[in-house]
């Protein structure tokens, strides 16, 4: 077992110390984290750059570096096509979804669902998100522990605890500002880790052309799978359609990302952060994909898993570091630091978002209902910090359970698809369909979640079959390799006997969840309204149900509703119900002012 040198440990220690120092710094400067808004939303004063980097780092973490590289090593480059879905989905998130949330100015994205449908819908969605993040955090902490075990021999227990403690410390102490600033330099170290692999392979191969040619000769360069079969793991359709649904579930309606977008100064800044995140995200994705080809070039004649040197594909990248970077002082430490940072940035984001959701969606309503009072800002801040500590401890516990999960990349994207897809459908239903009601929305969500969990976790599933791996250049006996190969061949031959829904590609989970929630909720809403079991009165501003709260819908629909309601505007009193609180106003609704009405009459 190889070990890190003194310079490697020095680099790793400096990286951890900087993260802790940033947390301490933001605890004692500026507002000193003395208000809930500053602690959870950075006082809504952040610039575009840190938010853009944080949007990327929050989810494209150690799972990306270890998982995507092995995806290309083992299955080829078809996964690269998913970057097109990022390009297609960014304008949808920036110009349709985010404006709706930005108007709310709230710490929890799920408050929208209470305004649109009711508290029961908000609670159901918030609980689903919490489950999603708790499952995901285990994978994220487990990944760097796996890397350190392969590179240094340090136990997974020690590595998991170090990552969890450091991350929890600076996130709890420094709040959102510390999280966003650390994400910048942690993102740069993530890139450094990936490019250290590429450059090392480049030096040893002599040119990038050699690496590309070897990958091409061995079937790794594959961008022509246009199959419409949903059971094929990666095709153009799975990557673009499934990728769009996954991207929007993460960057459009996920609390962790929207909370970052709420930390900037204006809606235009939030849109700019999303657009700047796009090239950063694609650059990391593409470079990580190519790093997988670099690693394949090095092990093309002796696959480490078939040789028995590692226990899973996710350990191959750290093994490459052991085999190639030891001669370069500090380079292995740089790689391990990048893996650490990839995990730290994600966990800190998850801790912050779970604290915000628990406070806003569970604790505050509970206190209001049971104690008949509201929390002061000082109490809210104190509870936020306690919740951050709790979720930091929870992420350490979940990491110990992640070792039983298979491939990191597929596990992570499956979780986002199974839960994120239905949540995307729920928000889309609320923002696009004025006739949707609460019972229909909850019914669609529950049906979709049940279906996605069924196909996502139902067993037995056919094992994943990789492209050909060679052991011709290995110096030891190949009996172990032959056993694995024979088991794989048998599994492929019997794949058609598996239940069809269990064979569906994991990339379709988000799209299927979205469609079932959206159309199922739409149909159920129509049925419940027909039977007079529910209505959609919450979307109206007045008691007569004539003026719709257009801000609850995406901008194109909101503008259409505005124009339609212009003749209904009066200067007399109107009733406005927001979040269950009814208020009386002596003027027209504030979002439909008299100036717009005068312009409308002039045009007419």
UniProtKB/Swiss-Prot annotation:
Membrane-spanning segments: 4-24, 48-68, 78-98, 134-154, 160-180, 188-208, 234-254, 273-293, 331-351, 389-409, 413-433, 440-460, 511-531
Membrane topology designation: Multi-pass membrane protein
Protein name per UniProt: Putative sodium-dependent multivitamin transporter
Keyword Transferase in record: no
Top-level lineage group: Eukaryota
PROSITE patterns: NA_SOLUT_SYMP_3
CDD domains: SLC5sbd_NIS-SMVT
């Amino acid at each position: 077992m190889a070990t890190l040198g003194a310079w490697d440990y020095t680099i790793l220690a400096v990286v951890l110390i900087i993260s802790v120092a940033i947390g301490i710094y933001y605890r004692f400067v500026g507002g000193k984290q003395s208000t809930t808004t500053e602690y959870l939303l950075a006082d809504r004063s952040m610039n575009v750059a840190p938010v853009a980097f944080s949007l990327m780092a929050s989810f494209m973490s150690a799972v990306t570096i270890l998982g995507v590289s092995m995806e290309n090593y083992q299955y080829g480059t078809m996964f690269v096509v998913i970057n097109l879905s990022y390009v297609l989905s960014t304008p949808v998130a920036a110009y349709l979804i985010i404006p709706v949330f930005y108007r709310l100015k709230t710490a929890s994205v799920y408050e929208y669902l209470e305004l649109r449908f009711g508290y029961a819908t908000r609670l159901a969605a918030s609980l689903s998100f919490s489950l999603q993040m708790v499952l995901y955090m285990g994978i994220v902490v487990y990944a760097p522990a796996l890397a350190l075990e392969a590179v240094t021999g340090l136990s997974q227990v020690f590595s998991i605890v170090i990552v969890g403690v450091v991350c929890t410390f600076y996130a709890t102490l420094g709040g959102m500002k510390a999280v966003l600033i650390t994400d910048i330099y942690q993102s740069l170290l993530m890139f450094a880790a990936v490019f250290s692999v590429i450059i090392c392979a480049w030096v040893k191969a002599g040119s990038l052309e050699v690496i590309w040619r070897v990958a091409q000769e061995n079937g790794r360069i594959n961008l022509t799978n246009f199959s419409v079969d949903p059971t094929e793991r990666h095709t153009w359709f799975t990557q673009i359609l499934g990728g769009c649904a996954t991207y929007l579930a993460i960057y459009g309606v996920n609390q962790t990302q929207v909370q970052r977008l709420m930390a900037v100064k204006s809606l235009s800044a939030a849109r700019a952060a999303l657009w700047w995140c796009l090239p950063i995200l694609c650059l990391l994705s593409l470079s990580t994909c190519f790093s997988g080809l670099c690693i394949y070039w090095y092990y093309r004649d002796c696959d480490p898993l078939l040789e028995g040197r590692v226990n899973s594909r996710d350990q191959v990248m750290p093994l490459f570091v052991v085999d190639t970077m030891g001669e370069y002082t500090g380079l292995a430490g740089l790689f391990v630091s990048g893996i650490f940072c990839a995990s730290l940035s994600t966990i800190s984001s998850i801790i912050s978002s779970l604290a915000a959701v628990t406070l806003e969606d569970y604790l505050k309503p509970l206190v209001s209902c049971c104690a008949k009072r509201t929390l002061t800002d000082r109490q809210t801040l104190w509870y936020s910090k306690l919740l951050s500590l709790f979720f930091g401890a929870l992420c350490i516990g979940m990491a110990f359970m992640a070792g039983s999960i298979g491939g990191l990349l597929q596990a992570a994207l499956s979780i986002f698809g199974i839960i994120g897809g239905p949540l995307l459908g729920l928000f889309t239903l609320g923002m696009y369909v004025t006739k949707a009601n609460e019972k229909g929305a909850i019914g669609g969500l529950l049906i979709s979640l049940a279906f996605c969990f069924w196909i996502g976790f139902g067993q037995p599933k056919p094992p994943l079959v990789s492209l050909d791996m060679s052991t011709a250049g290995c110096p030891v006996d190949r009996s172990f390799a032959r056993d694995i190969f024979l088991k794989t061949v048998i599994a492929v031959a019997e794949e058609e006997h598996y239940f069809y829904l269990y064979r569906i590609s994991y990339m379709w989970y988000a799209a299927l969840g979205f469609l079932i929630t959206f159309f199922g909720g739409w149909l159920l809403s129509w049925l419940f309204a027909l039977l007079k079991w529910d209505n959609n009165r919450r979307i109206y501003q007045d008691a007569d149900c004539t003026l719709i709260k257009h801000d609850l819908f995406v901008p194109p629909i909101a503008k259409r509703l505005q124009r339609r309601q212009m003749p209904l505007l009066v200067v007399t009193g109107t009733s406005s119900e927001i979040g269950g609180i009814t208020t009386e106003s002596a003027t027209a609704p504030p979002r439909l002012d008299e100036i717009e009405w005068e312009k409308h009459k002039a045009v007419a």
